[in-house]
Amino acid sequence: VQLQQSGAELVRAGSSVKMSCKASGYTFTSYGINWVKQRPGQGLEWIGYINPGNGYTKYNEKFKGKTTLTVDKSSSTAYMQLRSLTSEDSAVYFCARSVYYGGSYYFDYWGQGTTLTVSS
């Protein structure tokens, strides 16, 4: 199982960015994909989830309006778009596969992270 994320991004404040997470080694539509934010010196912050099988999405309220999650089943790729970027969006963003086991969800495989730098 591998989750390969797109490369680092340097973008202007106020613009948008779309990053990708390409899955391999398993059936893409059988597991959820989550996105997680980590700012320097801070903990992990869950952004949202997408079910690649049916396109169902669930977002952290904090990121509603900021983030759109999509998938392309034909290429086994998940995407996250962030809009109206500010310096607060500068962070490393991870995708992570979720698995349901024993009544709970766990993140069992992670991408390597995409570094986003927003410049003014």
From Swiss-Prot:
<keyword id="KW-0391">Immunity</keyword>
<keyword id="KW-1064">Adaptive immunity</keyword>
<keyword id="KW-1280">Immunoglobulin</keyword>
<dbReference type="GO" id="GO:0005576">
    <property type="term" value="C:extracellular region"/>
</dbReference>
<protein>
    <recommendedName>
        <fullName>Ig heavy chain V region 36-65</fullName>
    </recommendedName>
</protein>
<dbReference type="InterPro" id="IPR007110">
    <property type="entry name" value="Ig-like_dom"/>
</dbReference>
<dbReference type="GO" id="GO:0016064">
    <property type="term" value="P:immunoglobulin mediated immune response"/>
</dbReference>
<dbReference type="Pfam" id="PF07686">
    <property type="entry name" value="V-set"/>
</dbReference>
<dbReference type="GO" id="GO:0003823">
    <property type="term" value="F:antigen binding"/>
</dbReference>
<dbReference type="InterPro" id="IPR013783">
    <property type="entry name" value="Ig-like_fold"/>
</dbReference>
<dbReference type="InterPro" id="IPR036179">
    <property type="entry name" value="Ig-like_dom_sf"/>
</dbReference>
<dbReference type="InterPro" id="IPR050199">
    <property type="entry name" value="IgHV"/>
</dbReference>
<dbReference type="InterPro" id="IPR013106">
    <property type="entry name" value="Ig_V-set"/>
</dbReference>
<dbReference type="GO" id="GO:0019814">
    <property type="term" value="C:immunoglobulin complex"/>
</dbReference>
<feature type="domain" description="Ig-like">
    <location>
        <begin position="1"/>
        <end position="111"/>
    </location>
</feature>
<dbReference type="InterPro" id="IPR003599">
    <property type="entry name" value="Ig_sub"/>
</dbReference>
<keyword id="KW-0374">Hybridoma</keyword>
